[in-house]
Amino acid sequence: MAWSAGQYVKFEDERTRPARDLLAQVPLTRIDRAIDLGCGPGNSTELIVERYGVAGVSGLDSDDNMLEAARARMPGTDFVKADLATWLPDEPVDLLFANAVFQWLPNHLEIFDRLMDGLKSGGVLAIQMPDNLTEPSHLMMEETAKNGPWSDAFAKKSVRRNPLPAPSVYYNRLIGKSARIDLWHTNYNHALENAAAIVEWVKATGLRPYLDHAGAEHRDAFTADYLARIEKAYPPLTDGKVLLRFPRLFLVAVKK
């Protein structure tokens, strides 16, 4: 599945805030090498460089469009194409940082376990993932998929990503290799202009697999059906805006 950097950065401030909150809890005062996993257009990589300096910081992504945007944004930083499902650093590093990428990989628990082996002693695995499948924004994707001329395609194959395990599952999986693990949830409430803005937000991420699977011939109708459901699920506030509630899970593991 291809991603769109242009669509993603429409809400860059809101998308970058969780990366900033995650980085604030990384207990490293200096690094020799840090890698931004699933770097996207480079907005999270930029934060790492601002904190630790450009030397030793690189980004990694599997999408050519995102990598092109990241390289244009930060020409002095190395960005590499790689598959996170199998990737490991060539030598132990200080920080492996990932903002909103691993929710797409069903076996990310196994990947986290392996990534711990790619850290120096005292190194940090820092992860943030959306935990929003029970929010109306995502429930309405499933409702739309089940109702319409595209429903047969979704009956044959679901595109819904797997729900995240409980925090205790992450803790138990990683504590054997960790000196300390911090786990927490944050619920962001983003004030957006209207229901259409919610649709624009999710078109870059969660809605994209649904639109692709519905097919080009149904894309506009699927989007319109979804928007109608979102308008009912997110009533306007007194100033006409809507609140998009967005729960996210954070994990910071320090290697023994």
Curated annotation (Swiss-Prot):
Q: Which InterPro entries match?
A: Methyltransf_11 (IPR013216), SAM-dependent_MTases_sf (IPR029063), Trans-aconitate_MeTrfase (IPR023506), Trans_acon_MeTrfase_C (IPR023149)
Q: What GO terms fall under cellular component here?
A: cytoplasm
Q: Which reaction does it catalyse?
A: trans-aconitate + S-adenosyl-L-methionine = (E)-3-(methoxycarbonyl)pent-2-enedioate + S-adenosyl-L-homocysteine
**UniProt-listed Pfam families:** Methyltransf_11 (PF08241)
Spell out the family assignment given in the record's similarity comment.
Belongs to the methyltransferase superfamily. Tam family.
User: What is the role of this chain?
Assistant: Catalyzes the S-adenosylmethionine monomethyl esterification of trans-aconitate.
The keyword Coiled coil appears for this protein? no
> Domain of life, per the record?
Bacteria
Q: Keyword Iron: yes or no?
A: no
Q: What is its EC number?
A: 2.1.1.144
Q: Name one GO biological process term.
A: methylation
Entry-linked HAMAP family: Tran_acon_Me_trans
Q: What is this protein called?
A: Trans-aconitate 2-methyltransferase
Q: Which organism is it from?
A: Rhizobium rhizogenes (strain K84 / ATCC BAA-868) (Agrobacterium radiobacter)
* Compartment list: Cytoplasm
Q: Name one GO molecular function term.
A: trans-aconitate 2-methyltransferase activity
Primary subcellular site in the record, as a coarse category: cytoplasm
Q: Which UniProt keywords apply?
A: Cytoplasm, Methyltransferase, S-adenosyl-L-methionine, Transferase
Which stretches are annotated as coiled coil?
Answer: none
